[in-house]
Amino acid sequence: LNVSMDSLQSQPTTFATSNFTGVDDILFRYGAKVNTNLVMDLQCAKVPIVTGQYQDNMPQMSFYPWNFFPEIHPNSNHIVSDKISPVKLEFASTIDTTASSATKTPLLTTSNGTRIMNAPVNVSLNMLKQKQDPKLFNAGAKTVALLLEGEFSSAFKNRLTATMEENTQIAFKDFSDSTAMIVVSDGD
């Protein structure tokens, strides 16, 4: 989804809306679907907010938990994410797996205190003033980073022009060699 803290600097409220990237169909075929939602988590980073001024006109900052910035503890059962410190994501979405031949391994998951907000999402700094109801954070742990391993079909399979097919300098392959990719749903 398309949302940023910069938008909230000039106005108190913004909407998180779908952000077409052009890779959704490819990722879906490869085995991952980045959902059009936002993760809110009770285990989250804090953001600085101006809460006043000192006598010398310097801004006084206070830090508040911002549920849209989940702090993720990596999967310690995989070499890629083992021994990594907690990761702060900003405006993350959930990732679902889809039917494909790829091996799928969740690398980062939210805490059990997760809430999912489907797009469009009203994002407001006024939420910092409100006490969050823990009962609403009941979605359980959700995948926000996924490792895909295997052979992947080219997005250009069956789409080459006759000129491209005849060109011997183009070493086109319908499928990749065995490889891996990581899909992370961080919105920043």
Go through each PLM region and give its residues.
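Acidic, S/T/G-rich, low-cysteine, solvent-exposed domains in lumenal/extracellular/periplasmic regions
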Residues: 1-188
